[in-house]
Swiss-Prot record:
InterPro entries: G_OBG, GTP-bd, GTP-bd_Obg/CgtA, GTP1-OBG_CS, GTP1_OBG_dom, GTP1_OBG_dom_sf, OBG_GTPase, P-loop_NTPase
Entry-linked SUPFAM superfamilies: Obg GTP-binding protein N-terminal domain, P-loop containing nucleoside triphosphate hydrolases
Cofactor dependency: Mg(2+)
PANTHER family for the chain: DEVELOPMENTALLY REGULATED GTP-BINDING PROTEIN-RELATED (PTHR11702), MITOCHONDRIAL RIBOSOME-ASSOCIATED GTPASE 2 (PTHR11702:SF31)
One CC-aspect GO term: cytoplasm
Source organism, top-level taxon: Bacteria
The OBG-type G domain, residue ranges: 160-327
Residues annotated to bind Mg(2+): 173, 193
Protein name (record): GTPase Obg
Amino acid sequence: MKFLDQAKVYVRSGSGGAGAVSFRREKFIEFGGPDGGNGGRGGDVWALVVDGLNTLIDYRYQQHFRAKNGGHGKGRNMTGAKGDDVVLRVPVGTQIFEEDNKTLICDLTEVGQRYCLAKGGNGGFGNLHFVTSTNRAPRRANPGLSGEERALWLRLKLIADGGIIGLPNAGKSTFLASVTTAKPKIAAYPFTTLYPHLGVARIDAREFVLADIPGLIEGAHEGVGIGDRFLGHVERCRVLLHLISIQEEDVVKAYQIIRRELETYGNNLSDKTEIVALSQVDTLPIEECKAKQEALQKSVGQPVMMFSAVSHEGLDNVLRSVAHVIEMARADMINKHQD
C-alpha cells in the first residue's frame, strides 16, 4: 500500500429539512387544526480513528464528502428523518487542521476516538410550532438551516516507540528489516526509502514499534527533500536511534548534520533520548571502526554502539538499549497518570 501522510479534504454537513404546513383532516372533525411536523436534522461529518490503517492514501482519490440532508416534516406532526452521517476513517496519529494548514482542530491518538468536523443543520419548524392564542391556524413553516462547509487538512504523524534517523544510506531500512517483519525497499543508493515504514521489534520478551524515517539531509527543517514532514513523524517517538554509516568519511560531521536539523525544527525533538550507533561495521577493518567510534564518542559525549544488520554483530545490544529506554519512558508515563 502506498504511503500518504497529508491530504486536503472538503466536507459539507447536511442541511436541515423544511418544516411542513399541514392541517388535520379527519372525518367528522371540521377544524382539525395544524399538524405540520418539523424537518429532520442534517447529517454530520465525523472523523473516526480505526485500527489497521497507517496511511491517508484513500484521501488522494476521494476528497469531497457530503452528508445527507434531513427529511422534510410531514402531516400528523411527523418529524423528518435525520440525514445520514458521513464518516472519514483515519489512522491513529492523524491531526486535523483548518484550511491554513496551521490551526490545529484535533489530534486523534486512540482507536475509537472521533471528532465532529461539520455539524448538520437543524430542521425547520412545522406550522404546529407557530400556534398561538391569537393564531390557531398558522400557515407558515421554517426552512431548515444550511449545513457547514469546510476545507480541512489531514496530517498523519506516525505513533512509534522509537524513530530510526540518519542520513540517506545510513542503513536504517536494513536495520528495520533485520529486527522486524517489515519489508522496506533496500538498495545501495540514497533516498531508497521515500516514506516511513513501521515494524514491531521483539527482544527478551519485550515488544515495541520502530519507525524507519526517510533519510534526512541538510535543510530538512526547511522542507528540503520534504524533510520537515518526515521530522513530524519523529515527534511522537520516545527514543531516537541515530544511525551513522561507518563508511562516512567524517562520522562526526554526519552526526552533526542531523542534530542541527532536530534542533532547528524545534518541538523538543533535540531533547529526546538518543542512542547513537555506527552501522555497516562489517564493511571496514575493526581497527578503522574503533577509531571512528572513539572520534564520535568524544564529539557526542556518550557511548556509541556499533553493529552490522547483515552479520547481526552487535544487533541485539542495540535493540536492548532501545527497549530499555522505551520501557523507562512507558513507566514514567504510567507514574504521571497515577499522580
